[in-house]
């Protein structure tokens, strides 16, 4: 019996790819057509079901029953605006089944409806068969990749698709992380390197920043757009030619699904041509009502049609840099992943953004993700080859995790972007005397108050022996494993009594948009808070400086050392500033600083004359008010200093 191998599958929106790690290297496996990537297409006909190239090749003849883009539906609700928007572009029907989308097709003369998981499982089955044909024996273990931005229901649904395909899914990993592994094996150089992975595929766009150091990968930040890719560029071309056809032939082909599909196929081909040539021609015989459509498009025109989409790829790059707290000069390597990164304009924008830095194209952008997934699969199967042995992969928690303490405050134990797996422990105590139990409420989010964050779960720890407030010691541990499953345990140290909750990441968690929104909101509020803090400290500094100066010149010990004229000058100016402060408590930071400069110009020459080089009394800011005790409502648990 051959030792069991595991495969790595890049389940793409438009194309999928499979690899296997054996004999110390990765093989990307070609399908029966000799192609190393396989279209993520499934077609249903009167006689059979087709998957991959065979499905894509007959799409123009059978558009209603050829399903693609299942990845855009997987793990989403029917009412999701993304689903609603995409449905307009699809020639196949999507129906609503209890707010779950299903694809309706005609198969062997019957109407059938499939869940997105089922469609994806058919593609996964095809990838599994491609690997089995190459290896010559059955394969069941696999690592499957998803975009970094997939939320938990999308990840879970992808895992379900694997199970439906008869795979034992060892792990779901992020596509950029997989690409980084592929890259890491190629680069064994010493020292820490920051790598930015720019993955623009058929359907999703991900930017990730990783630190690679001595075989250890750490994901520092991820950003992107679950809805940007090669297909969006195809759509722009399709719309352009639909308009051109209207102008030339006074006919609207947009309602004819077969015509649009044939046009789209020609557009995709033209787009690929434009990556290597500056012009591409389209020749479609009898496109609509017997009219032949012969036309051409230049690279410049294509770039113009997609200019806003191309430019929008830089925003997530900036966001990822911000999240990773890195400057663009600190990125050592830029890695291109995904077929759309072959577009010269996209490469140029990225290169210009990084001030002419060379891009790394050594990895075939279509295969990098499957390559890394295959390596990860080998690691999880315990492959002992030295290429793989010292490779470690660290993922991150997308949001901070913590619990509610007195007054509804969010106390984070695990910070956003912390490397997982991780374990954090903190001691808490009771809020009132003889409190018999505590309610542990677990939240995720970036805001200061729990009411603005997302409640993941709660549990009681009861049976705490009567004691004054602040005496009992309750140890709370947050433990996240490599799959992102969170265990929260609370233990009363005096009795050893414990209770716990396991929060799996499959149901009712936040979507990418919500995570994004919460992070953005938190960033926005954080910026507002920062401005407010600076304003208050400028006001306090001015106020204390004015009062210090006032008391300095009124000091009995200075009698005779300061002329009455100077004294009056300082006191009048101080009084003017104090009155201005009373009238302008809400002034901006700049105004407070400006007033202080004015006051210093009057006071400094006089005061420094007095103290001969000794600095005058410093302007100590007033300390912030101590926070008030938390309200009596809410879980009565308090953080121990």
UniProtKB/Swiss-Prot annotation:
Substrate-binding domain (SBD): region residues: 394-509
Alphabetized UniProt keyword annotations: Acetylation, ATP-binding, Chaperone, Cytoplasm, Cytoskeleton, Methylation, Nucleotide-binding, Phosphoprotein, Stress response
Similarity annotation: Belongs to the heat shock protein 70 family.
Positions of the UniProt region annotated as Disordered: 617-641
Residues where N6-acetyllysine is found: 77, 108, 246, 348
Domain notes: The N-terminal nucleotide binding domain (NBD) (also known as the ATPase domain) is responsible for binding and hydrolyzing ATP. The C-terminal substrate-binding domain (SBD) (also known as peptide-binding domain) binds to the client/substrate proteins. The two domains are allosterically coupled so that, when ATP is bound to the NBD, the SBD binds relatively weakly to clients. When ADP is bound in the NBD, a conformational change enhances the affinity of the SBD for client proteins.
Tissue: Testis-specific.
Record PROSITE patterns: HSP70_1 (PS00297), HSP70_2 (PS00329), HSP70_3 (PS01036)
Name of encoding gene: HSPA1B
Functional note: Molecular chaperone implicated in a wide variety of cellular processes, including protection of the proteome from stress, folding and transport of newly synthesized polypeptides, activation of proteolysis of misfolded proteins and the formation and dissociation of protein complexes. Plays a pivotal role in the protein quality control system, ensuring the correct folding of proteins, the re-folding of misfolded proteins and controlling the targeting of proteins for subsequent degradation. This is achieved through cycles of ATP binding, ATP hydrolysis and ADP release, mediated by co-chaperones.
Protein name as annotated: Heat shock 70 kDa protein 1B
Binding-site positions, ATP: 12-15, 71, 202-204, 268-275, 339-342
GO molecular function annotation: ATP binding; ATP hydrolysis activity; ATP-dependent protein folding chaperone; heat shock protein binding; protein folding chaperone
């Amino acid at each position: 019996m051959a030792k069991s191998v595991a495969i790595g599958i890049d389940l793409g929106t438009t194309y999928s790819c499979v690899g296997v790690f054996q004999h110390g290297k990765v093989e990307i496996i070609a399908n029966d057509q000799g192609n190393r990537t396989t279209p993520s297409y499934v077609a249903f006909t009167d006689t059979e079901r087709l998957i991959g190239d065979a499905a894509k090749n007959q799409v123009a003849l059978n558009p209603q029953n050829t399903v693609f883009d299942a990845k855009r539906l997987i793990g989403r609700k029917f009412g999701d605006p993304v689903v609603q928007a995409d449905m307009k572009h699809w020639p196949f029907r999507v129906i609503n089944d209890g707010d779950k989308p299903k694809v309706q097709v005609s198969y062997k003369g019957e109407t059938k409806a499939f869940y997105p998981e089922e469609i994806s499982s058919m593609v996964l089955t095809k990838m599994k068969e491609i690997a089995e044909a190459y290896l010559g024996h059955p394969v069941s273990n696999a690592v499957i990749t998803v975009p970094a931005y997939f939320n938990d229901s999308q990840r879970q649904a992808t895992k379900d698709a694997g199970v439906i395909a008869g795979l034992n899914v060892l792990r779901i990993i992020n596509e950029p992380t997989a690409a980084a592994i592929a890259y890491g094996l190629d680069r064994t150089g010493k020292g820490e390197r920051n790598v930015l992975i720019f993955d623009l595929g058929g359907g999703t766009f991900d930017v990730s920043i990783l630190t690679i150091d001595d075989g250890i990968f750490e994901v520092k930040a991820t950003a992107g757009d679950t809805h940007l890719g090669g297909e969006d560029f195809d759509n722009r071309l399709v719309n352009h030619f639909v308009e051109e056809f209207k102008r030339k032939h006074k006919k609207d082909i947009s309602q004819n699904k077969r015509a649009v599909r044939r046009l789209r196929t020609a557009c995709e081909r033209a787009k690929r041509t434009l990556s290597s040539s500056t012009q591409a021609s389209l020749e479609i015989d009898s496109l609509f009502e017997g009219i032949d459509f012969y036309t051409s498009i230049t690279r410049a025109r294509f770039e113009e049609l997609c200019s806003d989409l191309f430019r929008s790829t830089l925003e997530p790059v900036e966001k990822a840099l911000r999240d990773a707290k890195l400057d663009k000069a600190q990125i050592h390597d830029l890695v291109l992943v995904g077929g759309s990164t072959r577009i010269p304009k996209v490469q140029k924008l990225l290169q210009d953004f990084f001030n002419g830095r060379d891009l790394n194209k050594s990895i075939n952008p279509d295969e990098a993700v499957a390559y890394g997934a295959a390596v990860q699969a080998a690691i999880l199967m315990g492959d002992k080859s030295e290429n793989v042995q010292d490779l470690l992969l660290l993922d991150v928690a997308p949001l901070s995790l913590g619990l509610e303490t007195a007054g509804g405050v969010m106390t984070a134990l695990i910070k956003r972007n912390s490397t997982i797996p991780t374990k954090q422990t903190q001691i808490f105590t009771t809020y009132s005397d003889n409190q018999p139990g505590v309610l542990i409420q677990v939240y995720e989010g970036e805001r200061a108050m729990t009411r603005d964050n997302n409640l993941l779960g709660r549990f009681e720890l009861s049976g705490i022996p009567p004691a004054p407030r602040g005496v009992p010691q309750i140890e709370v541990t947050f433990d996240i494993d490599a799959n992102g499953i969170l265990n929260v345990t609370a233990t009363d140290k005096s009795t050893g009594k414990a209770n716990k909750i396991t929060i799996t990441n499959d149901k009712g968690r936040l979507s990418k948009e919500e995570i994004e929104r919460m992070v953005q909101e938190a960033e926005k509020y954080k910026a507002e808070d920062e401005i407010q803090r600076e304003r208050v400290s400028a006001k306090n500094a001015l106020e204390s400086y004015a009062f210090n100066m006032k008391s300095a010149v009124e000091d009995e010990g200075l009698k005779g050392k300061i002329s009455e004229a100077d004294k009056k000058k300082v006191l009048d100016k101080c009084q003017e500033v104090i009155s201005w402060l009373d009238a302008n408590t809400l002034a901006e930071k700049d105004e407070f600083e400006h007033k202080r400069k004015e006051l210093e110009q009057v006071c400094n020459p006089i005061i420094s004359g007095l103290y001969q080089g000794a600095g005058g009394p410093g302007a100590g800011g007033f300390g912030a008010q101590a926070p008030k005790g938390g309200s009596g409502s809410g879980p009565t648990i308090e953080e121990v200093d």
